Regions:
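C-terminal scaffold of the Radical SAM
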Residues: 2-10, 30-54, 61-328
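Short active-site neighborhood of thiol/selenol oxidoreductases, capturing the structured segment around
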Residues: 12-15
């Protein structure tokens, strides 16, 4: 890759819509599928990458690549390597030595060999979807890993040489208390070495998800396992103060980083930087044009990525309104 220093910063998002089992709260475009489907999807994804008109990116520098899902670590590591080879070759003129390249991983789905392949492919940042250090809470929201699974994956990551590791956490989970939330934060901050970055999100019960239906059914029977708004707010404020005491600084609503370890990709969104997306349901926001791919995996594999959907031309007023909103 060329070490470029372009004036315009660009982000890239790559969507891998597969997982071993969909979590109860997830409303993202994702599904469990066979390796046959995985391979066909990866082939279509690489076709989309290679079909992008890279000539229109003159003057840009690719500052970040984020491989999300789904669970990207649920597909063969060789597929991830193929994707990164396509990115580095097709976008060679805008890739730089300091490009941040992140892959989302589910604890328990990574091996030492997978991590070696990721590093060889140029990936330099991992994001683990832990959510909780309490096994009963993980089971309640349909996560397939345990706290011990996470600790093993975290150890393997550092043994493989990854020094930039994010840990995703969630609060206001069913049956979660302030005490168990405090325990999760304490256990994560006690890891050696500490994560360079922690994200803490309040659970949102998205309509149409199994967890939302379950909670609604329980509430109809007079059972409410969710925290009230005051407790939710208290959990958030506790995370802010506790993580500050552990050396993290908050640079965005849900993100906390050690000094100089902020996520470039996260900052790009909050600073309204341009980005391009590849994969099913992936969106692009470049210039005055915003568009996305189909949400249908089969249609995407069949070549629907060639015809973008929901195309929107933004005015200067639209961009100013968005900038003000994101800055609130």
């Amino acid at each position: 890759m060329m070490n470029t220093d372009k004036n315009k910063q660009l982000g890239m998002y790559i969507h891998i819509p597969f997982c071993i089992r969909k979590c109860k709260y997830c409303d993202f475009v994702s599904e469990a599928a066979s390796d046959f489907v995985h391979e066909n999807y990866i082939n279509a994804l690489i076709d989309e990458i290679n079909g992008y008109d890279a000539g229109q990116l003159e003057g840009y520098g690719l500052r970040s690549v984020f491989i999300g899902g789904g669970t990207p670590s649920a597909v063969k590591a060789e597929y991830i390597s193929r994707i990164m080879t396509a990115v580095k070759e097709h976008f060679a003129d805008i890739c730089g030595h300091f490009t941040e390249i992140t892959i989302e991983c589910n604890p328990g789905t990574v091996t030492a060999e997978n991590l070696r392949i990721y590093r060889d492919a140029g990936i330099n940042r991992l994001s683990f979807g832990l959510q909780s250090a309490i096994d009963s809470e993980l089971e309640c929201i349909g996560r397939i890993h345990t706290w011990d699974d996470f600790k093993n994956s975290y150890r393997l990551a550092h043994e493989a040489g990854f020094k930039n590791v994010n840990v995703d956490l969630m609060f206001d989970l069913p049956d979660q208390t302030m005490d168990t939330w405090k325990r999760t934060l304490a256990d994560v901050c006690a890891l050696e070495p500490k994560p360079s970055h922690i994200s803490a999100y309040s659970l949102i019960l998205e309509e149409g998800t199994p967890l939302a239906a379950q909670i609604e059914s329980e509430r109809e029977r007079g059972i409410d396992r969710m925290a009230d708004e005051d407790t939710d707010r208290a959990m958030y404020h506790y995370a802010q103060s506790y993580l500050a005491g552990e050396g993290y600084h908050q640079y965005e609503i849900s993100n906390f980083a050690m000094p100089s370890m902020e996520s470039i990709h996260n900052l790009s969104y909050w600073e309204c930087k341009e980005y391009i997306g590849f994969g099913v349901a992936a969106a692009s926001n470049k210039g005055d044009l915003r568009c996305r791919n189909t949400y249908d995996i089969d249609r995407y594999i069949a070549g629907a990525w060639q015809n973008k959907e929901d195309i929107e031309h933004l005015t200067g007023r639209d961009r100013m309104s968005e900038f003000v909103f994101l800055g609130l």
